[in-house]
């Protein structure tokens, strides 16, 4: 196991260096693109009669349980690190767009994408049951801000826009995981559960996650307030994430939601009432480093998964069609939500011009979608959905991620809007 971890970290570090030294793309996008090119080179060498490197790389990647690694270890830490730097007062200011997009938006997207997929699959010769189409809709609905947030900041996006994108993505991961789990349960049971059973499951996972995260966050906050030793306080935050995520799985509550809530408590109340200036610096630097390392590992793994996923040009064509369906669903969820806010709340100040375009095009899909696809039960539907999900995620990160910056600069060029900044 240690040799696997060492090999993967070494390869990711090399890819990160190559991107920073020669390619200069935004870090996460660059690492994934470099890993993708590396995968293509390895496959090319195999076609030329040198298969040994491809065989070795496939063995390394096959031994990594992407779904387990991301959902159990990476995602809780990434969400905690993201929430740690979100100002709670900003989140409250934009709670309506964030709340609508992270809850109703995920549900609407699940059914819109699922419905469009149901009618798209036969066009390419595939007959897929509607329940699998809904699973695809649920797993592809959460957005991933990691690749786009830094670009938005450097491009001068308004603070309300950046806050909405970050806030939505922090919570819609948890919502999507819960919705996915409910639909997967229906598939495995072979019959639809009652409304009361579905409601109980949702309350247990989502509300339970909020309560559990609040208890964890407040407990660690009290412990940090009683000491002034940055080494111990950093260890407390690390134990909160690792131990809290493991315990959440045992309690059958949403670990992603719990880590977001705990991160908000530590990043706001803990920062102001339980940390010295020295502790703040070390906690911030520690979690910034963890965030960068895990993101590099995650996006490198996404790029390297190409070595394991067989797909044809038919898959590529279908993925582009489904990518269009994802954008349509994004427009159908974002557009009405923003228009309603402007109409009934007079929210022009909170919803700058161009918000709909940026939210639609900036709604990148990421590792959570791939991890959920990998957790589907074995069968031809899983293989198909996994290949299509992977291509949709790749295209989303590369196409939308690399073009969102120029779009932001074009929309807000010359406008005296407040630029987004770090939360603290």
Curated annotation (Swiss-Prot):
> Could you tell me one molecular function GO term of this UniProt entry?
potassium:proton antiporter activity
| pH dependence per the entry | Optimum pH is 7.5. Almost no activity is detected below pH 7.0 or above pH 8.5.
Question: What is known about regulation of its activity?
Answer: Inhibited by amiloride.
Alphabetized, the UniProt keywords read:
Antiport, Cell inner membrane, Cell membrane, Ion transport, Membrane, Sodium, Sodium transport, Transmembrane, Transmembrane helix, Transport
The record describes its membrane topology as: Multi-pass membrane protein
Q: Where in the cell is it found?
A: Cell inner membrane
Q: Which InterPro entries match?
A: Cation/H_exchanger_CPA1, Cation/H_exchanger_TM
A biological-process GO annotation: sodium ion import across plasma membrane
Q: Does the keyword Nucleotide-binding apply?
A: no
The regions listed as transmembrane in this protein's record are 3-23, 25-45, 66-86, 96-116, 130-152, 170-190, 200-220, 246-266, 296-316, 320-340, 358-378, 384-404
Is the tRNA-binding keyword given for this protein?
no
Family statement drawn from the similarity comment of this UniProt entry: Belongs to the monovalent cation:proton antiporter 1 (CPA1) transporter (TC 2.A.36) family.
Please explain the role this protein plays, according to its UniProt record. Na(+)/H(+) antiporter that extrudes sodium in exchange for external protons. Also has weak Li(+)/H(+) antiport activity.
Q: Which protein, by its recorded name, is this?
A: Na(+)/H(+) antiporter NhaP
| Lineage of source species | Bacteria, Pseudomonadati, Pseudomonadota, Gammaproteobacteria, Pseudomonadales
The gene from which this protein is expressed is nhaP
């Amino acid at each position: 196991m240690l040799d696997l971890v060492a090999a993967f970290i070494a390869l990711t570090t090399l890819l990160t260096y190559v991107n920073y030294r020669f390619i200069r793309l935004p870090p996460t996008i660059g690492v994934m693109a470099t890993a993708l090119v590396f995968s293509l080179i390895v496959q090319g060498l195999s076609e030329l009669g040198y298969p040994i490197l491809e065989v070795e790389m496939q063995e390394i990647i096959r031994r990594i349980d992407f779904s387990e690694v991301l959902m159990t270890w990476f995602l809780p830490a990434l969400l905690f690190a993201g929430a740690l730097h979100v100002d709670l007062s900003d989140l409250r200011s934009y709670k309506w767009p964030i709340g609508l997009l992270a809850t109703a938006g995920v549900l609407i997207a699940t059914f819109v994408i699922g419905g469009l997929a149901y009618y798209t699959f036969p066009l390419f010769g595939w007959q897929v049951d509607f329940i699998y189409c809904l699973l695809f809709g649920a797993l592809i609905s959460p957005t991933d801000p990691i690749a786009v947030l830094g670009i938005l900041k450097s491009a001068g996006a308004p603070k309300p826009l950046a806050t909405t994108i970050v806030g939505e993505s922090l919570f819609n991961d948890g919502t999507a995981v819960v919705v996915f789990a409910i639909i997967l349960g229906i598939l495995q049971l072979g019959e639809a559960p009652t409304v009361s059973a579905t409601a109980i499951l949702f309350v247990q996972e989502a509300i339970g996650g909020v309560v559990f995260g609040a208890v964890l966050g407040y407990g660690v906050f009290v412990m940090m307030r009683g000491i002034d030793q940055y080494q111990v306080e950093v260890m407390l935050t690390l134990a909160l994430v690792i131990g809290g995520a493991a315990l959440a799985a045992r309690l059958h509550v949403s670990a992603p939601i719990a880590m977001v809530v705990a991160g908000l408590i530590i990043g706001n109340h803990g920062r102001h009432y339980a940390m010295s200036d020295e502790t703040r610096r070390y906690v911030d630097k520690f979690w910034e480093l963890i965030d960068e390392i895990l993101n590099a590992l995650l996006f490198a793994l996404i790029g390297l998964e190409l070595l394991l996923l067989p797909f044809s040009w038919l898959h590529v064509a279908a993925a582009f069609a489904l990518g269009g369906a994802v954008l349509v669903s994004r427009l159908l969820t974002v557009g009405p939500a923003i228009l309603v806010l402007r109409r009934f709340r007079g929210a022009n100040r909170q919803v700058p011009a161009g918000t709909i375009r940026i939210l639609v095009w900036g709604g990148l899909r990421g590792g959570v979608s791939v991890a959920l696809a990998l957790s589907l039960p074995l069968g031809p539907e899983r293989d198909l959905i996994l290949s299509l999900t992977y291509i949709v995620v790749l295209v989303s990160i590369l196409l939308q991620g690399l073009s969102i910056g120029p779009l932001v600069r074009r929309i807000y060029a010359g406008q005296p809007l407040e630029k987004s900044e770090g939360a603290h």
